[in-house]
Amino acid sequence: MNNNDLFQASRRRFLAQLGGLTVAGMLGPSLLTPRRATAAQAATDAVISKEGILTGSHWGAIRATVKDGRFVAAKPFELDKYPSKMIAGLPDHVHNAARIRYPMVRVDWLRKRHLSDTSQRGDNRFVRVSWDEALDMFYEELERVQKTHGPSALLTASGWQSTGMFHNASGMLAKAIALHGNSVGTGGDYSTGAAQVILPRVVGSMEVYEQQTSWPLVLQNSKTIVLWGSDLLKNQQANWWCPDHDVYEYYAQLKAKVAAGEIEVISIDPVVTSTHEYLGREHVKHIAVNPQTDVPLQLALAHTLYSENLYDKNFLANYCVGFEQFLPYLLGEKDGQPKDAAWAEKLTGIDAETIRGLARQMAANRTQIIAGWCVQRMQHGEQWAWMIVVLAAMLGQIGLPGGGFGFGWHYNGAGTPGRKGVILSGFSGSTSIPPVHDNSDYKGYSSTIPIARFIDAILEPGKVINWNGKSVKLPPLKMCIFAGTNPFHRHQQINRIIEGLRKLETVIAIDNQWTSTCRFADIVLPATTQFERNDLDQYGNHSNRGIIAMKQVVPPQFEARNDFDIFRELCRRFNREEAFTEGLDEMGWLKRIWQEGVQQGKGRGVHLPAFDDFWNNKEYVEFDHPQMFVRHQAFREDPDLEPLGTPSGLIEIYSKTIADMNYDDCQGHPMWFEKIERSHGGPGSQKYPLHLQSVHPDFRLHSQLCESETLRQQYTVAGKEPVFINPQDASARGIRNGDVVRVFNARGQVLAGAVVSDRYAPGVARIHEGAWYDPDKGGEPGALCKYGNPNVLTIDIGTSQLAQATSAHTTLVEIEKYNGTVEQVTAFNGPVEMVAQCEYVPASQVKS
C-alpha cells in the first residue's frame, strides 16, 4: 500500500467498526427538522431550492452565484442550519493573485534539469511552458529516476486535497505513478500519528477516525463531560467529506443542559477554547494544565482513583489486562516516586486538592471523556492517548451510553447518529495493471517510511530507525511529487525542510494555489479547484445524511486542468492511458460511481434514482432511518464474542507487544517522560519561556483558504497572522494589541500580529497552523517569515520510536515587539515570471 492509499484508509477508518453496521448501513436521525420518508427504506427527495449552482466543499454545501463568468458569492445550502463562516472565502479560492495559471518550471531547473542549482529553490523565479513541455519533463524525470536510481528514490505525497469522490488528487497520483513504477510509500499522518499507532495496541483499533457515541445518548446519560484538549466548536467547521454541520444542534442542546446544571463540563486545556467560551465561562470548570504535563495529571488522577478506592475493580478484571504491571509504577514502587497529586502539582500547576476533586467527580457519576488530537501531537504523545484509556478503564464506564472515552468527537460530525444509506466509491489509487518499470528492488532500503520522517530520509539516507516494532532503513530520495498537499503547512521545522528539498534532484507540485511547496518545486502544474469540475460527494460524514451533486460553477481558469486529465496525459506518454482512465471520462466515471451506489443500495434496501434524474433534476438525495450507537457497547456486553483487536482481545493497560520492542521512550505501560523542551520551568524554558500552540485555524482548513483576502481581512493583525498572548506576558514585553512582533527560537523567526487575550494562560501563546510561509530572503534557510507560519518554529522530531509521529506542540519560543522595517507580505502574489531567460531543453541534451 502506498502513501496515498494509506492516507485515504486512515481518513476513512470512521466507516469501519460501527457496532456491527457496515459501510453501507450507517443509520441516523434528522437533526434539525423532521424529514418525510417516501418508501420505507428509500432515499428521500428533499425539497430544496434551485437558486444558484449547487456544489460541495470541505466547509459545507453551497449555492454559488456566477456573474460575468466569475464565481462571486457563496450562500449556504438551505439544509445547513449552522454554516461555516469560511464559505465567504470560497470565491477567492477560484479568483486570487496566488492562483496557479499556467504550467511553470523553475529557471535553473529548466536549464540544467536534475543538475540544477538547488539553492535557487524558493527564489520564486519561474518560466511559463506549454502543457506538452511540462508533461514531457514530468515523464522524462520519472523515467530517469526509475532507470538511474530505482523505486527507492521516488516519494509521492498527498493530503487534504479537495472534496469529491471522483476528483481526488491522492488516488489519481497513486494510480498514475503505480502504472509507471514502484516508489516509496508512507504510513501514518500528521493529525493523529501518535494515537493511531498506540491505540490499536491498547484497544485494537485506531479510534481517532471512528464514530462516537450518539450525542442524544450522551446528553441523556452523561453527568460530567471532560473536554481534554478538544475544541469541538472550532474544528467541526470543516470535514473530510462535505459537512452538514448537524452536530452543532447537539452543541446547542449541550449548552442548554450546562446552563440548567444538568451536565457539568470540565475543560482540561491551557486555553479557554471556543467551545468553552460558547458554553459559558461561568458554567465550565477550567483546568488550565501547564502545556505538555497532561500525563502527570492523568497519573495523579489514576493514583487518586486507586488510593481512594474509587476505581472499578470488576471492569479491570473482566475487560482489561496488565493493571497489575502498571500499578508499581503508579504507586512509586518502581522508581521511588508515587505519581500522586502532590507530585503532579509541581509539574502541572494544578493544585493537588483540585486534582483529587476532579478524580472524585469523574468517579461519582457517568463521565464522558472527549479527547482531542493536539495533546498527542507532542513528544511522547502516545503516553497521553494510552492514559486516556487507562483512566476510562478505571472508571469502568467504557461501552455505556454517555461514558467511556473517545478520540474523534471534534471531527467529521462525530456523535451525529448515522443514517441508513449508501457510501459512494470513488477513484481508487490501486491498479492490477503491472507498471512499465516493474522493479521491486529497493536496494536494501525500506519501501515504506513514517510520513513525519520523510525529511529525515532526504537528509540522512541509510539511517536506520525503529518504527512500531519494525526496523526502517531510510531510502535515498531523489525526487518528490506532491499533489493536493502542502508540506510547508503540515511538516515541522521549515528551515530543515528547505535543507532537505535542496538535496533533491527534482520536485514536482500539482496544485491550484502558489503555496510554499509550489514555490520550492521545479515543475508546477495548475490543477482546477472543485468549483471548476463536476463530482459527487457524501453530504455529512458520520451522519451520512445524503449525497450531493457537485456541479461545475465556472470553467477551468486560465490553463488549469483537472487532476484526472493531467495524469491521463502523463500516462499516455508511457502507454498506460487506457489503464488509468479505464475508458471513461469525467461524466463516465460519475455514472459508474453512481451505479455502484445503486447496486450497493439494493443490497441495503435503499433506492437511489437513476443518475440522469439525480444529476439533472434532484441534485440531492437524503437518507432516513436513524439508529443510535454506543462506542464499545458490543465489547462490553460480550467481550468473548466481541473481542478487541488486541492480542488478548481485551484493553491492554500493559502491552507485552510494546514491552518486547525494548524502546526506552515508549515502554510496556504508560509513563511520564520529560520533554526535550517544555515551558513553566521545564527544559529550555529559561531562554525560550513561552509554549507555542499551532492548532487548527478558525478561518481556514490547514493552509486552504489562506489565499482568501475576504477571510484574511477578518483575522489578520497588521497584515500578519495573529499570535495570541496572555496579558501578563504581553505587559512584561511591552506588547500591545495590534503590535507587530517577532516570534523566535533557535530554529527560526516569524513576524506576527499581537492579540492580547486572557483566554490564554500565562506562558502560553498560539499561532494557528496553515499560515503561508513568506520568507524575506527567498529560499534561504533562516529567513524571517514576514507573514507568520508557525512551522518555522516547531521542532521536527518523532514522538517516540513507536509512532515516529509529529511533535509539533513540543515548541518553545520568545516574543518581542518588532522595531525593524515591516516589509510587505508577498506570499499571496504568485511567482515572478521570467521571460526569454532560457528555453526548454529536452532531457537528451542535458549533460551529466
From Swiss-Prot:
Mo-bis(molybdopterin guanine dinucleotide) binds at residue 191. Keywords: Metal-binding, Molybdenum, Oxidoreductase, Periplasm, Signal. GO terms for cellular component: outer membrane-bounded periplasmic space; trimethylamine-N-oxide reductase (cytochrome c) complex. GO terms for biological process: aerobic respiration; anaerobic electron transport chain; anaerobic respiration; regulation of pH. Its EC number is 1.7.2.3. One of its GO terms (molecular function) is molybdenum ion binding. Disulfide bonds: none annotated. Its cofactor is Mo-bis(molybdopterin guanine dinucleotide). It is found in: Periplasm. InterPro entries: Asp_de-COase-like_dom_sf, BisC, CT_DMSOR/BSOR/TMAOR, Molybdopterin_N, MoPterin_dinucl-bd_dom, Mopterin_OxRdtase, Mopterin_OxRdtase_prok_CS, Prok_Mopterin_Oxidored. Binds 1 molybdenum-bis(molybdopterin guanine dinucleotide) (Mo-bis-MGD) cofactor per subunit. Residues 1-39 form the signal peptide. It catalyses: trimethylamine + 2 Fe(III)-[cytochrome c] + H2O = trimethylamine N-oxide + 2 Fe(II)-[cytochrome c] + 3 H(+). PROSITE patterns: MOLYBDOPTERIN_PROK_2, MOLYBDOPTERIN_PROK_3, TAT. Exported by the Tat system. The position of the signal peptide cleavage has been experimentally proven. The keyword Signal applies. Its main location: periplasm. Pfam families: Molybdopterin, Molybdopterin_N, Molydop_binding. Interacts with the N-terminal domain of TorC. Belongs to the prokaryotic molybdopterin-containing oxidoreductase family. Reduces trimethylamine-N-oxide (TMAO) into trimethylamine; an anaerobic reaction coupled to energy-yielding reactions. This is Trimethylamine-N-oxide reductase 1.
